[in-house]
């Protein structure tokens, strides 16, 4: 992370909290920001209303900059046959645990609605995982005063983020815990470790002036 990026983000320490969707809290994000790093809210599973509530909670606890992260994903719309087949496959597991099968009423949050909420909330940083924005979306965030950070697992993905206007790229290597954010090409092509991926991305993005952040 470069000193120019630190100045742009308004933080004293080169530390960005992992968004950790599902296990983060506004209190944690506020504490990290108050300590000189950049606190983050993982909003991939938050509704627009929940995003607004979480952002307000952070702002009540600190006046320091913080960021919000979204999953770039299409909202699934499986047909009835697919849902029924899945329920039948899961039925024995529910029975083994003595539970009644619960038919899903929602598959994930609607990204378009989340994105609109993000623009309206105007956090210092808007970051993204599992996909990529288009240039118009990045421009809307810039107009709202947000620094845009994209996640990349390959140099190809890092260059794609630079092409649409991202300010920084978070280079996430093979060691990423739990899941990968690969969105271009096959997962098997994204087997580079973070310590190797970071300098590769730095070299590739230097001509565009795009900063590189090493993922944890």
Describe each region flagged by the PLM:
Residues 1-209:
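Active-site entrance/lid segments in N-terminal catalytic domains of soluble metabolic enzymes
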Residues 209-216:
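Glycine-rich adenosine-cofactor-binding loop
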